[in-house]
Amino acid sequence: VDAFADDLLLLVQGNRRNELEQSASEALSVVYRYGTNIGVEVSDSKTVCMMLKGSLNMLNRVVHVSTNGMDDKRIRCVDRVRYLGVNVGIGMDFSVHIDGMKRRLTTAIMRLRGVLRKSWGLKRGVVSMVVKGLFLPAVMYGASVWYEQLHKRKLRGSRRLSEELVSCQRVVLYACTRVCRTVSTEAMQILFGSLPWDIECFRRANCTKSKGPAMNESDLVTDEDLYELSLHECRELVDQRALAAWQDRWEATSNGRVTYEWIRDVGFSGRSMKYFGAEPEGLLRLTGHGSMNSFLFSRNLSNSPACACGTEREDWIHVLCECDMYAAFRDLDSIGVRRTEVGWDVSGVLLDRASMSVCVPLSSCAFRMRELIVQRMRENEES
């Protein structure tokens, strides 16, 4: 028996269906009699049965509960139940919890779209506070209970629950970072400074488990790592391991490689949004996704990948570092861009506040000038 406030959970076991039904009936009859004695009515609509393990099919069956001469109660068997805010399916399946979470997040984001626009709306600090103070706690509620199932799949061949959880994060990040829809989730996480939600789930669960329960193989730390450490030191170690796991994932993925050129260390994630804010041209050069001809041509949205200057390929690095049309705005040494044997290195730009203070206005002028050039070329073609 597990009770919290007015919610009650009864666990019964048996090897056969009739054993389960008899045990459940006996336990529930005690609950109904106790409620009658103290004047509390048990809600028939909220009282359900569900199989937590085994292969017996109890779905759509009814458990009859005797209540001492009163009308017998009929308890229906269901395939999912919500207990203390966490949705659980048959066989301790938490995929129903993540599916429901994604629907609720999508609904909440739709209601916030009025203040989360691409060119205006809430400031970056307010948006970050909404995500960290509203969305993240709601998503991570009960994480220490269901995080161990993130490696499982709902169906054979389907995505893992960890991937489903990250897809929930994408819904929030796309609304908050104001980037193109084609930008990868990995790049959005770096730009916004948001730990991948599956890793965040493990981090929070491990911080909770550091108080006593033993760790397992899937955790970020082991019992030996936490031996003789204080609670504060345990949580610091968990945070370090979470960042290390994020760093390994960021280096291994093939997505968001333009963003990787700017921000290679996840410890600096979120810094770009602090400097660039919601400027479309700033996010364009950090992601490579936008109005560049090479990007548009790769998606059959432009007739040619060439630049107006005659170069065969117009991308973010060409506009920022090479194109002669923007030479008047260019000062690569002062913004920390270096020429290497393999190309241009922009990884040091965001590391220094002085270089950023020069980079932002110079590159913004170059990209705005490009938009004017493109607009005039279109007007000439139409005329």
UniProtKB/Swiss-Prot annotation:
Residues 1-88 form the Reverse transcriptase domain. It is an enzyme of class 2 (transferase). Residues 229-383 are annotated as: Nucleic acid-binding endonuclease. Its EC number is 2.7.7.49. It comes from Nasonia vitripennis. This is Retrovirus-related Pol polyprotein from type-1 retrotransposable element R1 3. It catalyses: DNA(n) + a 2'-deoxyribonucleoside 5'-triphosphate = DNA(n+1) + diphosphate. The keyword Repressor does not apply. Keywords: Endonuclease, Hydrolase, Nuclease, Nucleotidyltransferase, RNA-directed DNA polymerase, Transferase, Transposable element. One of its GO terms (molecular function) is endonuclease activity. InterPro entries: RT_dom. The keyword Nucleotidyltransferase applies.
